[in-house]
Amino acid sequence: KHTLPDLPYDFGALQPHISAEIM
């Protein structure tokens, strides 16, 4: 798990974006 705060919205929608950031 990465250092991220508990997001109030659906985190699943951000997963693709997060993956792109890590890459």
Curated annotation (Swiss-Prot):
Pfam families: Sod_Fe_N
Cofactor note: Binds 1 Mn(2+) ion per subunit.
Official protein name in the record: Superoxide dismutase [Mn], mitochondrial
Organism lineage string: Eukaryota, Metazoa, Chordata, Craniata, Vertebrata
Similarity comment text for this entry: Belongs to the iron/manganese superoxide dismutase family.
Function: Destroys superoxide anion radicals which are normally produced within the cells and which are toxic to biological systems.
Localization: Mitochondrion matrix
GO MF terms, alphabetically ordered: metal ion binding; superoxide dismutase activity
EC number: 1.15.1.1
Subunit structure comment from the entry: Homotetramer.
